Amino acid sequence: MIIIGVKRNINNSNNSNSNNNSNKKKDKIMSHNNNNTITGKNTNEIMNNNNNSNNNNNNNNNNNNNNNNNNNEEVKTEPIQQILKRLNSKNKIEVGATPNDIPTSIPSVKNLGKKYDSKAETHLLNQKVLSSPSKEVNSLKKSTNGTNTIPSSSIPSSPPSSPPSSSSLSSDRTSQDIPKSVNGLTASIVAKFSKNIDNNTTNNNSNNNNNSSLSTPIQSPRDSLETNPIKDEESEESEESEESKEEEEELKMGIKTTKTTSETIESSYSTSQLLKNDLIQEKGDDNNNIQEPQQPKYPTQTSFITDKSKRLSTPPINGTSISIGNNNNNNNNYINGNSGINTIPRNFQSHRVAGDWKDRKLNTLFTQGTVGGNGQNGTVRKNLIGTRELSTSSGILQCKDDSSSKDQDFEFNNSAGSSGNSSASNSNRNSIAFSSSNHFSSESSQSAPTLPIYNPSQYTSPSTPQSPSPSPSPPLISSKSIYINKPPPPHFNQQTNFSVSPTKSPSNEKQQQEDEDVKHLVRAFTNRKLNVHHAERKSKISVQDAEWIVKKFFHDTDRQSKFVLSENRTKDLNQPSSQFSPSTSPSTNSIPTNLLLSNKRLSTSLPNINTNINNSSNNTSSSSSSSSTTSSPSPLTTSSSTSVLPPPLSSSSSSQLTESLKTRIEENNNNNNNKNINNNNNNNNNNGRNSIHDSQEMTELEDPHSSPSYRHLEEVGKKKYVSAEPSRRPGIKTPLFLNVPTLAMPTQFHQIPPERVSSNLFSVSVEENSYPDNPLLFNQQIINRVANDKDLSYLFFPVLKSSTKITSSTLNNIIPINKLNNQIHNNNNNNVIISNNTGNNNNNNNSSKNNNTVKGNKKQQNKSSSSSQNNSPPSDFSLSVSPSPCSSLTPSPSPSPSSPLIESSMFTKDLSPPPPAAAAIVLQQPVATTNNKSTDKDSRKSLWSSMKSSKPPISTSQPSTIQDTISTSPPSTSTSPTSNSPPTSISPPPPSITTGSSPPSTAGTSPPNDNGNNNNNSNKELTISIPITNVNVHESNIVVASTPRSGRDLATIVAEEFKDRTDIVFCTQHLSMNRIKVRSASLDAMIDLLTNHRLSQPDLVESFLLTYKTFTSPLAVLTKLIERYEETDNINNNNNNNNDDLIISTRTTATITNEDEDNSNSNSNSNKTNKNSSRTIKLGVLSIIKCWVDRHHYDFERNKALLSAIVAFLEGPVIDDGMEKVSNIILKIIDRKANEAEARRTGTALVMHTSTSHCKFPPSIPPSLSKPDQIPTLQNFDDLEIARQLTLIEHEAYSMVKPNECINLAFSKSDKEIRAPNIINIIKRSNLLPLWVATEIVQEERLTKRANIIKKFISIADQCKNLNNFNAVMEILSGLNLTPVFRLKKTWETLPRKYLATFRHLNSLMAPKFNFKVYRDVLHTKNLPCLPFLGVYLTDLTFLEEGSFDQAENGLINIVKRTQIANIIQEIQQYQQLSYSFAPVPIIKDFLLQIGGLQERALYKQSKIIEP
């Protein structure tokens, strides 16, 4: 049989007189043991000494003194019985040893792997022990295997000079009971004692210090890890006298523990374990000596799973109290004499991280067990992780315990003998000690605050003050009803004694079932989060746990209330006053009171817990031997019925606990109009605070829910319930980049993600905005934040920085629409209210430039505001086109005085001379105060819809009279300017115009004069009578109409111009949206449409020139254009009655100056309608020819006859018609294009002057060559520089692609080398580069270098993606996905996860699923320069060409097909405009141009060789 020693920490104490005799006898025993002989007397002395070392009575330390002083007399007859009588008590340790205090339950790291040998059956058996206490005895008897041995401790020996001590303070190792049936000592016992006697001599030297607050730890090995720091020797020496006196008093009380049945059961089981391990355990080895595998496995942090004797600790007997505190000793803890079966269960959840719960069946207890269920799974789950149920009723705080324990009074106490540092604090639980005494003392810490729940007797001045002992104190909570009758101190000082007498109450199951998990979280949070020394340690409790506890403790009342500090209160708090120390000496450091709770329930809601605060004279500062002069925080002075908050749990420093109470009380004082704090010097003393903390206090007082952090709110919403960490093996760490936004898992902002795509090889979802350039405005939360934040608005919409803001003077000049009927001004001089220039025009001429614009022209809306055609209140801002749909109203600067004439098309801007312009009145019919609900609804619509439904301007003929204009232009009441749908358009009867002087009434937005003529003396007015309201317009206030002529919309104009033609079919749906889309037409009809004098469609012109070769020849088109030019005499006379109309060309310059306006007014009465119309048609023809020559000169490079015909036409009829300037412009363009083509053929092409020519090139990265003459390889070049040079090569080839190579499938015909040489070159290189990638990988026979090559290509592809070179990304991925490379499983397995994640991401990005949907979405958000993957466009062109008919059913040309082809070609041309600004590196560029590779069959053979 083996008697196991206990590891102890040696405390050098001055109390050495009581053990002199024992040390002498031990020396005598040493000599006897060396000779392997022993007498009965010496044996008794050995056992007595060992008994003294293991004997620890938590309630009475003086019992140890008596045992040590009388050990020679008591134990002479029955040594074994004396051992059995004492062995169940808690072992003593000596405090103050060197840091050799690593728990013996934790072996060396090398041997950790040997401890995880538990089986599934053992786990389940242990859980049955947890869940069914009545069956624990049977399970304990069945589980007596060799793995549950309690090893002996390696006891550090103290130096010879250290004085012996009388008794050990506490024990952190469990000791086993030896049954009384054992009647003698065997030789092995003597051998064991002889081997360990040297250590036992030091162990018997125990200290006499009073550590009554030290709790007896529960025997779970994990509790041994929750250690408090070791007490200093000086503090122990200063406490010896006081503690010894208290020990004597406790000894007189005669409180003795009684042994229960459960105690006997465990004692017999422990003895059987000792007997069984006697044969296994050899000589007195160390606990940590576990090198031999045949030796039993000693308890480690995880081996308690198989230790069935210490699965559950027993509840205390009735009449005893439990001290739950921080047992910070470093060895295994054991239960005191009152150990049984039904004690508070352990929370093993935190150990799941260490890999203990490897069994699947056991894991179901955490995942499938019902928390509140009555079944076995629910009970086991509650025993393991605890339930979060709390009942708060009428001032009594009741915690529900999951274990069915009897009526006990739990006292949360602190363990003495702890400093600010803990060596192995790996457990969340505090140790629970059983004590039959109800009196104990707690020594609070400097750093870790205690919960302010206390008893009046705590602050009574003790007769014997104690010296300060730095030890973090846990919460002091009585398990029954707690009534706070004393005000809490400003903060608990070092020597504050708390004597809490538990209140007896009848048996109540609800009170018995205390919420153990809540208590665990409270203690762990107090010891970990609030301890400054534990700040660097990762705590097992999270902020969510602490906030959850706070929310469960208090009600949800007063959600919106917040604390506001008044000036008087701030002044009072800043006033210093005398010190205060309740029954103790003051603390050495004053905690600022500004650190207040941020939790709104702690700071605002009044709980139901009755806490009466009485400011009695007992709280005055008492004398202390070691009192200092430091001041304590501000006092609390309230009425006796003030409610105080329960323990706050979410603070981050010790002062927050008491400061929250102060804040609550001071708020009540403020509510009672007590603006000044009553400084009661008899009770408390104020502490002056630094003014630095005042601003911090105001910040802390703010409700976190008033201005929440969006990220915090999202995390809180996701983690409504705190979940346990998943099981993992101890050696596997969590990847560091899993929770960080990476290429594989980018940060997502989509509320509804797009469709997930995957390639054939890797199936990984990629969101649309996994790239950095995407505007992340899909989340409504982000939209709202941007809308309410000025800086963010400027960040997302840079156009707002240069915008004109709406000033107050502008708003004052705006007449609301709903008041247009009622406002009548007698000011004849200011009829125009809305103008560009804010302020009133006091001259009789209203010549300020109006902001009325063309209907719906998006391009022109950037230059002028739209206020005349909308029923929203006119204002100074205008709508600017923004790429983001979220910027519905983006103010842009109002332009300088500009003409409302229609902006000319981009291809006729420099051809048409400025024609004269006529004047017409365009009135916005104001909507008076009517009962039309639809009108009111439309007036509230956003103006963004009107922009989206806008239409390019339409040039129409001008009516000759004002009467015709007014009668044919219906006022619009819709937000869409040109909408003519019945619900949104009202056509009033034609108004009657009366000439004469009448009282002016500004009932609408009278447009100002755009003319240069200022009729200052004009008193004659045009009064236009409209049934809705009266509008007074000066005769000079005439603006040139920018709407379709005669007020007709686009559908009407198209119907009039092509009413007799059957060779053209329009799409009526697009006409209703003011867009022209032709379904099918003949060549003649298309030429007539493109050159029509009333319609301007530049997009149709470009589409026609791109695709006309698919249905006709260039010579035929030129012939049709010349015929149209000469067809001016046969224009339809549809407007014969409008002889005074002026045909305004839409192909003139965008703005018209005052001189042009004068010319237009001087020619307004001309009768040359036909001549002007013919001139407009001729300009239209010349515009098409100019665009053809400039943008599509490749049609003339191989067709010299066509070019000669155009030159003859320009030098002949065009000059004869007086258009010499237009002819010279086109001829210059022809000469320039011819010179450029000749330069390209000769190879002397000049460098293209692009917008990047002025940019600085980024510095190139030269290759790393060891020798100048070394042949460079792929590994010598930098990944980024390879991507740059590859991008330069490919973009140069891409920019040479011509539009004619994309039509008629020229790239797939037999003569493709001639018709599409540039596309063929790109296709060849795209097929060569993947073979080169595969060849570089397969040719390397060494596995490591082969993996490095794969990593390099993945990195190059990633760099190409960052450079927007998607063509190179696709090429490299194609090479990596080839079968010869992809089959190399051993090579791919050696790649780091970082590269594999990047490879999967790139594959998902370029996946062909859903017709490259993800790639297309990403591409459309990239800015130039960009290099797209050309294969996607070629695929689209192939499908369009082969899947659609060239002609429609009526035999006409299928224009829809041509339009779609033109859109694809225009997108290809879009990315050719801007080139990359990288400096070419010749050595890398030449290397990339000379690449080559094996064919796929040879690659596969080589792949089989390197990896069969």
Swiss-Prot record:
Composition skew (Basic and acidic residues), residue ranges: 223-232, 399-409
Pfam families in the record: RasGEF, RasGEF_N
Region Disordered, annotated ranges: 1-73, 128-182, 197-272, 396-517, 565-593, 606-727, 831-1021, 1153-1172
Entries under CDD domains matching the protein: RasGEF, REM
Domain N-terminal Ras-GEF residues, every copy: 1074-1234
Cellular compartments per GO CC: plasma membrane
Cited Gene3D superfamilies: Ras guanine-nucleotide exchange factors catalytic domain (1.10.840.10), Son of sevenless (SoS) protein Chain: S domain 1 (1.20.870.10)
Biased composition range(s): Pro residues: 465-475
Top-rank taxon, per record: Eukaryota
Biased composition (Acidic residues): 233-250
Function: Promotes the exchange of Ras-bound GDP by GTP.
PANTHER family, A to Z: GUANINE NUCLEOTIDE EXCHANGE FACTOR, RAS GUANINE NUCLEOTIDE EXCHANGE FACTOR Y
Protein name: Ras guanine nucleotide exchange factor Y
Lineage, opening ranks: Eukaryota, Amoebozoa, Evosea, Eumycetozoa, Dictyostelia
Gene designation per UniProt: gefY
